[in-house]
């Protein structure tokens, strides 16, 4: 398996500087990673750095809390795509999910997917460390019903990251036809292999150059 193509090479720290984004892109090209994942403000820079390469530009929407208005998330996603993003990782409204408003969560994901279009990969961050197993299942089913391309474990900015148990449950819930991205705390080749074994087919990590 080409593990390089599983990796979203990630830098989402709030103090990330332009030269660090350039380095991120250079490493992604060197190792032929699937994408770089950067905050929306750095999408134009990443798109310019990666022009002519196979590495995609990924960004985050409603990040990291997910508590924005749906229309704000939609506008943010559309603008990011206009600026060069090819993949969008959105954060759901966890409070609405926990309150049992699965229809709200599903509709929000659907609106963003419709807005960015079928050619843009949409990943749905469900922040598994904040959810029990029932909530993980419900979040995954909402994302699948809304037409998302992936479900993703974590923002990397909450109380925990990806776990083998959560990834396995997510894969069991969405089946083989939908992607599962493990993100948060994947820092070694052994971590990567464990997540892939559990069912992940995309890995979000800031340590891509070290773990391959």
Which positions does each model-derived feature cover?
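Calponin-homology-like cytoskeleton-binding modules
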Residues: 38
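Alpha/beta enzyme core
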Residues: 1-31, 41-63, 67-180, 188-210
């Amino acid at each position: 398996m080409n593990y390089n193509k599983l990796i979203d090479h990630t830098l989402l720290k709030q103090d990330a500087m332009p030269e660090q984004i350039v380095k991120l892109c250079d490493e992604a090209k060197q190792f032929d990673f699937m994408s770089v994942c950067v905050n929306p403000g750095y999408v134009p820079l990443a798109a310019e750095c990666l022009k002519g390469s196979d590495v995609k530009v990924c960004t985050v929407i409603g990040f990291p809390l997910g508590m924005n208005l749906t229309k704000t998330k939609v506008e943010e996603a559309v603008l990011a795509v206009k600026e060069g993003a090819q993949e969008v990782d959105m954060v759901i409204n966890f409070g609405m999910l926990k309150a049992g408003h699965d229809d709200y969560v599903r509709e929000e994901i659907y609106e963003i997917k419709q807005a960015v279009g079928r050619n843009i990969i949409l990943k749905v961050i469900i922040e598994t460390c904040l959810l029990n197993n029932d909530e993980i299942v419900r979040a995954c089913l909402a994302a699948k019903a809304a037409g998302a391309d992936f479900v993703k474990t974590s923002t990397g900015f909450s109380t925990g990251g990806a776990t083998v148990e959560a990834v396995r449950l997510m894969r069991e819930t969405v089946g083989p036809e939908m992607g599962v991205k493990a993100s948060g705390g994947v820092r070694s080749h052994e971590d990567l292999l464990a997540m892939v074994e559990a069912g992940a087919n995309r890995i979000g990590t800031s340590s891509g150059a070290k773990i391959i």
